[in-house]
């Protein structure tokens, strides 16, 4: 039998009597034990990074280069491919070794974090204030809290700049808009014009406006990261070297549970934004890796049948459909030439395989008759049969599959999971904000635990 580092392994102030929280309340028992709470957070980070590394290696082991990523149920390799690792023209995977390296690095990192989590949870000091005052804190210390906020902002800003450096100096990133069907390229001229970058924030979120989700070129994405990274770094320095203003002290609740609620609210917003980005955007989330968007699959089907019937002799410019509108082509509300049929609802779709066929007034008839390239036909046919949809009825005219066809788009997985998680985080935000505000007002201690069913169970030890 091995000797434990800490022979006592006593609860040490983590029991119900001393904290007001029982074991099933988890980290709430550690609210006033900064060292133990550090251990919980480091261990949690270790679990997250372990999942990333293990799942990364799992996807590498199962990856078949001859098939598109979105046909293989992958969600991590598409992210690495979007960063320009291992991919060449057209999104073709030419080297899987960078993916293997990524998985191994994450696994090694998770081991370090896991050790740190166990150490600080069991062996290290329970509180940091006495031995390491720089890392110690009290929740009501407003200056310390904003300093911690500042350090977090600087780290986030550095993370944003990592993408900028990767795109500009270290191999570039994958650009689905590169001529000929996408390629990995260096971003040499990122957009730094604040009117363009912050213009996205001022746009309507509805329809073709699409708020920040409407970003459609890599220059704006990298330029946006330059702005956000710089603002976060300078904002972090500001928060470290200043104290909160009087109105800030009055406006906010300054307690551990309040900070939890703020964090949950922020991550809920990020979950909802990620949901919309993953579902609609085909620049930050290239369709070569994630599969087509819903509008993209619908438009590609209309394009595929236009190509087929044009070859069979149809006059695609004048043919009428069953409603009397154009069967293949029609006019948009603003007078542009667009695809006809049910896909008319997606008339403002933009995609790299379709844009070369547009002119000043929408789709160019001359280009449709003479300039369609084989790669555009192949890509549209592939996207048409991989819509991010189940077998629904109202799907923009996309031919749905029989139930035995087992395809679920990564866009469906990512959008659904981020929406659901964002919603749960938002509910948690409301819950903890309500508790924190009530506690600050002095009239709410929490739910009466006298009737808690768990209290009737035998103690774990």
From Swiss-Prot:
| Topology term for the membrane | Multi-pass membrane protein
Where does the protein principally reside? Answer: plastid
* One Gene Ontology cellular component annotation held by this UniProt entry: photosystem II
Compartment annotation: Plastid, Chloroplast thylakoid membrane
What detail does the entry give on cofactor binding? Answer: Binds multiple chlorophylls and provides some of the ligands for the Ca-4Mn-5O cluster of the oxygen-evolving complex. It may also provide a ligand for a Cl- that is required for oxygen evolution. PSII binds additional chlorophylls, carotenoids and specific lipids.
| One Pfam family per UniProt | PSII
One of its GO biological process terms is:
photosynthetic electron transport in photosystem II
List the InterPro entries hit by this protein, alphabetically.
Answer: PS_antenna-like (IPR000932), PS_II_antenna-like_sf (IPR036001), PSII_PsbC (IPR005869), PSII_PsbC_sf (IPR044900)
Provide the positions where the record notes the PTM Phosphothreonine: 3
**N-acetylthreonine occurs at which residues?**
3
- What's the domain of life for this entry? Eukaryota
N-terminal signal peptide? none
| Alphabetically ordered keywords of this record | Acetylation, Chlorophyll, Chloroplast, Chromophore, Manganese, Membrane, Metal-binding, Phosphoprotein, Photosynthesis, Photosystem II, Plastid, Thylakoid, Transmembrane, Transmembrane helix
Span-the-membrane segments of this chain are 57-81, 122-143, 166-188, 243-263, 279-300, 435-459
Q: Which residues bind [CaMn4O5] cluster?
A: 355
Write one Gene Ontology MF term.
Answer: electron transporter, transferring electrons within the cyclic electron transport pathway of photosynthesis activity
Function text: One of the components of the core complex of photosystem II (PSII). It binds chlorophyll and helps catalyze the primary light-induced photochemical processes of PSII. PSII is a light-driven water:plastoquinone oxidoreductase, using light energy to abstract electrons from H(2)O, generating O(2) and a proton gradient subsequently used for ATP formation.
Assembly with partners or alone: PSII is composed of 1 copy each of membrane proteins PsbA, PsbB, PsbC, PsbD, PsbE, PsbF, PsbH, PsbI, PsbJ, PsbK, PsbL, PsbM, PsbT, PsbX, PsbY, PsbZ, Psb30/Ycf12, at least 3 peripheral proteins of the oxygen-evolving complex and a large number of cofactors. It forms dimeric complexes.
Family indicated by similarity: Belongs to the PsbB/PsbC family. PsbC subfamily.
| The protein's name | Photosystem II CP43 reaction center protein
Query: What taxonomic ancestry is recorded?
Result: Eukaryota, Viridiplantae, Chlorophyta, core chlorophytes, Chlorophyceae
Q: Which gene encodes it?
A: psbC
